[in-house]
Structures are given as structure tokens and as C-alpha cells.
């Protein structure tokens, strides 16, 4: 019988008396009697190595009075429920609704989806059944189902029912229990007098209309999204020069290529758009393709101007003006403030796309989102151009376009790479005399860090992703990781992790969480 000292990651210390012939699994059971960590979640570290359950204490050369470190690991996944095999019908049913995730568990385990359901914006949304019902009616599949089933429409009008459904969606264990109950009910459905009739009505009244509406929508989208390059190409080679992609009148230059010669090009060009103009066009208009917005773009022997009588460019004056400099360009690294892979998964979800477009097209919801986010409200008050842009329905629709958001994410990653490589040192507080640049017109006016903070506060779902949207975001800690994670580094070194660079990298990626950092180091 020897005495082993136990030191947990929470700085709790105690000792146990064990025999050296027992296994590590039995050793964990003894430890579980003196701490709150279950045996299956214990990670015991000795001499920088994690102990395996089948090893004995003799094998690892542990002796009387030695100290081992105890870390709480992740809980093991629950075993899949055992289901009875039911006879499969001869006619095969459709596999699922097009555009809807086939595995709802994977979608609900997405951290971004969980943050969305836990946000105050979702709570306020469920308190107003009218807005929620309007969002559901905006989906053609759900609209057909609700029109054919008044009882379901009445359920969507009850805030209590909606809140109970939300609580179930927030709790993965509760949802799994509900799905197990549904599986058991389906197995025993033949014992219910009206079981098969209920199942038939559920299929004919709910599933079949959803399938029909979704198939029609998917067919129409496939028809409209056909590749125009493939359908319009002919066998003859194209000898025409490619037009300038950054020019606002590229269509006219492509149709008449000779008009772009130096002898025939006018010194002053203007374009008037009486319809809904491209909000991004005037950002790149003017001589030399400047990013000035068409107001102060003075090139060499060429002056460009736009007169948008329709939906004008709300970002023109933000990026325009002579020589303000690229103020706050360092904030582009934190633009959107989220993991690009998770954002990509969210953008590819058609349900999330419809919800986002619905939120952004509702002025009342946009105003509520601005009111609940003090940081966004302050930006609106200090920047009239941004407020005008957020009130522009066409611009909001373009902002919710998955292609545009993917492009913004790629721009974020590119700016982060440039900053990591030292191209943009010190946050790029301003690039001084950038007003000329051969007619580029300057890029002053708007602080990109404000634009990034706005999307960081919105959290990816129109203000719904950030659970702390009602509080002001704390300032970023500028201390080096060695000082910021000093205590965590000492704990890792005591546990036997001597690679300081790897420890700093793990702590930085986990934001100082010692347990997650240990899991990352042990992979």
C-alpha cells in the first residue's frame, strides 16, 4: 500500500492509498471517490505522459509519495440506441427534402447555431409570434403546409409552444430523448388503434406537400442557375479582347471594342443609371479604376463621374475623398469575427440563408437589432453613410448574398495572412498621402475596424449570433501570450509539457483554457 498525491487542474490537492498492482482504470475509480470528476472523464498525467487504462501502476514506475496530475477530459459519446429492425416497404420513399440538412444533429451541434438559439435576439423573436409566423410564411414549403394544417398554424401563434420548442432545440440531450421517444412510438405504432391512420395523415398532409414544394423550388433554381458560359459558347475561337472587369461601363466597351482606343476615348465620361444601380460599381469607377467612389477620382487626362438616380452607392463617400489614407486597415483581420469554416457551413445552409434574408429585409427587425447592440448603435450615430447603407434594401440583399459574403471571408483571410507576414505592421493606422496613386482617388473615410466590429457584433446571423450583444465588447488584450498565459504556462510545465512554443500555440488557440490546451497537445 502506497500513498499517491493527486493534484487537479483546479489546484485541488489530496492523496489516496492504493496498491501498486492495480490498473489505471481501478486507480481512476479510487480517485473518483474523492473528487467530482467521473472515472470515464479523468485524464491522469505522470512524467508528461497520459496514462492508459490497461496499464498497472508497477509498469509506469510510480512510487510512494509521488504526485500525479488530474485533468478533466471530454465525456465519451453515448452509445447509439438499439433499435428493432422493421420490415422495409417495397416502394422506396424519397431520401429527404432538397436543401434541408439530412442530419439535424450535426446542424444543432454547430457552435454558431447554438449561439444563435441562445441569443437575446432569438428570445425577443419568439416573444413576438407575428414576426416568427411571417418568417415561416416566407418559406414556400412551410406556407403550403400551414395553409393545409390550421392546427400547426395555431401552434406557431402560441409563444409558450414556441419557447418550449426552443428549449428543446437548445438542449441536445432533450432533443435526443425526444427522438428516442419518437423511434419507440414508431416501433409500437401498430399497437395504437389509430396509429397507421395518423402516420398516413402525417405523410399526406405534411411530408408530401413539403417534398413537392421543395422539389419544384430546387428544379427552378437549377434551371435559373445554369451556366451561361457553357450554353453560349460556340466552336469558333473568340478573338475579341477581354473587357476591363473593374470598369462600370464594361458592357459597352465589350460590344464596341474600337471605342476604347486612345484616339477615340473621350476625356470626360459620365454614366447615368436611372434604375437600381450596382452599389459596388462606383467604388471602382473613374479614371484608372480608382477606389474613390466616383466623387474625387481624378486620373491622368481622364475624369469619371456617376449620377445614380436609383439606389445609389452607400459606400461611395466612405471610401471616397482625396487622401484620407487606409485608416484602420488592421481591423480587417477581425472582420466578421468568426471561424471561416463555420461561416462557410452556415452560408451553405439554405435555411440559414432564408432566415438571414428575411431578417435583413425587415426594417423593424433591423431597427431592433441596432437598438439592442450598443456598439452598432454608436457606429450608426457617428457614421450617417453607414446608417444610410443599412436602410438600403438592395444593399442589404447584396450583403446577404452568399457569394458576396464568401468573398468578404476570403478578403478577411487574405488580410490576416498579410498581417501575419508583416506586410501590414502595427494595425496600419493610416497610409498618409495615398490620395494620388495615379488616379485611384484615395481610400480614406471609413475605418475598416469599425466595419469588422459591426459584423463581429452581429455574429453572422443578423445580430443573433452573439449572446452578449447587449454589452459592450471588451478591448482586445495587447499583452504578449507569454505574459497573458503565464499561470497556464506554469501549470503545463508542471504537468510535464516542456515545449514552450507548443504550449503558447495551444493556449492561444483555446484562449487560455487549460483543459482544451492539454487535449490539443495530446493529439
UniProtKB/Swiss-Prot annotation:
Comp. bias regions, Low complexity: 215-227, 245-278, 297-310
Domain UBA: 480-523
Compositionally biased spans, kind Polar residues: 228-241
GO molecular function, one term: polyubiquitin modification-dependent protein binding
SMART domains on file: STI1, UBA, UBQ
Region annotation Disordered: where it falls in the sequence: 70-99, 215-325
InterPro entries attached to this UniProt entry: STI1_HS-bd (IPR006636), UBA (IPR015940), UBA-like_sf (IPR009060), Ubiquilin (IPR015496), Ubiquitin-like_dom (IPR000626), Ubiquitin-like_domsf (IPR029071), Ubiquitin_dom (IPR019956)
Domain STI1: 100-135, 139-178, 339-380, 383-415
GO cellular component terms, semicolon-separated: cytosol; phagocytic vesicle
Gly residues bias locations: 285-296
A biological process from GO: ubiquitin-dependent protein catabolic process
Gene3D superfamilies attached to this UniProt entry: 1.10.260.100, DNA helicase RuvA subunit, C-terminal domain (1.10.8.10), Phosphatidylinositol 3-kinase Catalytic Subunit, Chain A, domain 1 (3.10.20.90)
Keywords: Developmental protein, Repeat
Domain Ubiquitin-like: 2-77
Role noted for this protein: Stable protein which acts as an antagonist of nosA by repressing cellular differentiation after the tight-aggregate stage, when cells differentiate into two precursor cell types, prespore and prestalk cells, prior to the formation of fruiting bodies.
Protein's name in the database: Ubiquilin
Source organism of this protein record: Dictyostelium discoideum (Social amoeba)
Protein encoded by which gene: ubqln
